Amino acid sequence: MGRKWANIVAKKTAKDGATSKVYAKFGVEIYAAAKQGEPDPESNSSLKFVIERAKQAQVPKHVIDKAIDKAKGGGDETFVQGRYEGFGPNGSMVIAETLTSNVNRTIANVRTTFHKNGGNIGAAGAVSYMFDNTGVIVFEGTDPDHIFEILLDAEVDVRDVTEEEGNIVVYTEPTDLHKGIAALKAAGITEFSTTELEMIAQSEVELSPEDLEIFEGLVDALEDDDDVQKVYHNVANL
């Protein structure tokens, strides 16, 4: 799964570069998680997980605290999750996951983004069947066999464990992501660079330079949308 690891790193690096956009999107996600349960990460596991991911993305404490305080203060915005799927040039596929307080606005914006950037939006399920929802855990290490044994002993449903560039990369069934994190923490591993649910393409395509430029414009435009939280695709050379 080396290629998949490379794509995850590339996507994470690109997002980390646009810091203000990353902070704002995590702020929305933290607020939404806090509103759905208690605004206390110790009693709200969803909120705790989002905060951990925000810290991995270097989101400052004041941004996290502001989002939680807004939820505590009785903010009346309600956010709804969504997923939009579509196609780019030459067999390229893209999934955009959204979190929005205005679904009609988001649908209109996403449709327009596809249309203006050489893509075609599809129906629900049009491309997601070609992706596997996967738990991904990344941390420093060089002994994947040992990590696999730890997870196996904890009865975590693991798809793969690899070593990539001095990091251990664990791929789990989506339902076992939190179980895998807990097992690793129990084994003394406490620092993670990634703990995410990712949609990983079952197969990938390589685009020509011309098609790649079009597709990159589509992905960038989707990621620039304030309502879009994550973008997944199947292009190997992006």
UniProtKB/Swiss-Prot annotation:
It comes from the Bacteria. GO terms for molecular function: DNA binding. Its main location: cytoplasm. One of its GO terms (cellular component) is cytosol. Pfam families: TACO1_YebC_N, Transcrip_reg. SUPFAM superfamilies: YebC-like (SSF75625). The keyword Ribosomal protein does not apply. Keywords: Cytoplasm, DNA-binding, Transcription, Transcription regulation. Gene3D superfamilies: 1.10.10.200, 3.30.70.980. One of its GO terms (biological process) is regulation of DNA-templated transcription. It is found in: Cytoplasm. InterPro entries: Integrase-like_N, TACO1_YebC-like_2nd/3rd_dom, TACO1_YebC_N, Transcrip_reg_TACO1-like, Transcrip_reg_TACO1-like_dom3, Transcrip_reg_TACO1_YeeN, YebC-like. HAMAP family: Transcrip_reg_TACO1 (MF_00693), Transcrip_reg_TACO1_YeeN (MF_00918). Belongs to the TACO1 family. YeeN subfamily. This is Probable transcriptional regulatory protein llmg_0242.
